[in-house]
Amino acid sequence: QDLSEMPDLGAFYDRTPELDTLTTWILQQHCRLIALTGISGIGKTTLAVQLVQQIKDEFEYVIWWSLYPSPTLTEFQDKLIQFLSQSDNLDSPATNQKPLPLIKYLQKHRCLVVLDDIHSLFSSGELAGKYKPGYENYRSFFKQVEQLSHQSCFLLIGWEQSREIPQTNSQNTPIRTLKITGLDIPAAQEILRDYELAEIENYSALILRYQGNPLWLQTVATLIQELAGCEHEILLDDTILLPERLKNSLHQQLSRLSEIEKQVLSLLAQASEPIKRAKLLQNTLIPPSDLLNALQSLSRRSLIEQQADFYTMPLVVRQYVNSTFT
């Protein structure tokens, strides 16, 4: 195992349905490539750590690496081959063979490879999932992982995923995407309980306002604690607080947006209710094809939500956009 880059689990709040889904995909359906995506702070990495702790004994090799700062594909493959070939040589020290191609190791051994910060491979200032110059060969590598027969699994974690990874799942392919959403109210209440805020009046309103996002709730709960119980004032109206840690988290993700995405987000942020796609398309400043591409990209980033042909965004994102995109 190489789990030296895997974070400590820390506090973990109930994600039983997501854990069950991932476990089924990996151990029963033998999926080869799984994308774990969601907005910053939602708990993707924490969920993956819990998953690894639960299923690591089912694999010969378990590897957790961060792709920050962006190793080239050659560097990444060489490092992975070196790790797996050293393990092989320890098992049979008399052999003095050259390392095999990576796919051969994935076929020979059951490996779980977790790659965090997958968004580090993608360009800033572009629509979601466009590889940076010099990193486009990752596209064909992940396609190989998906299509060639082997007994290993790659779990990709990030705010963005490659454009080639479908957002809808088919039982006929060995590739899956799981978009992580907020905690349900009982699980999110555990966060407030950690901050001695679980019994405040209208705690569910606070959870819903911050959409069950663990990081958002933790930063707001910390602020409430430090201001000695300002929760009553906060809950009196629809105030959305943006503590510095929360703003920094959003900045890291939203600073990567293309200009067209920023325009579309600003349009959505000005509306107090969900906007119909047809109404957005009436905007004469944005060509329809550009607008539709931006909506798709923002949805893939989990920055907007779509219900039928209506679009909206989390209240926290709206507050950030209205205070930042001027």
Model-derived regions: residue spans:
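C-terminal interaction surface of TIR/SEFIR-family domains
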Residues: Q1-S4, G10, T16, K247
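Post-nucleotide-binding-loop coupling segment downstream of the phosphate-binding loop, primarily
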Residues: L9-F12, P17-L27, C31-E126
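Alpha-helical sensor/transducer elements of the RecA-like P-loop NTPase core
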Residues: R15, T46-L47, E75-K79, H119, ...
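Hydrophobic, repeat-rich solenoid/adaptor surfaces of innate immune receptors and signaling proteins
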Residues: R15-E18, L22, A35-L36, V49-V52, ...
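Conserved catalytic network of the ASCE P-loop NTPase/AAA+ motor domain
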Residues: Q28, K104-K108, Q144-Q151, L257
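Short catalytic/ligand-binding loop motif for oxyanion handling, primarily in non-cytosolic enzymes
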Residues: G43, T72-L73, L121-S124, S162-P166, ...
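C-terminal boundary/linker of central alpha/beta nucleotide-binding cores
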Residues: A48-V49, Q53, K247-F325
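A eukaryote-biased feature capturing mid-to-C-terminal, repeat/solenoid-rich segments of large proteins
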Residues: G229-P243, V321-T326
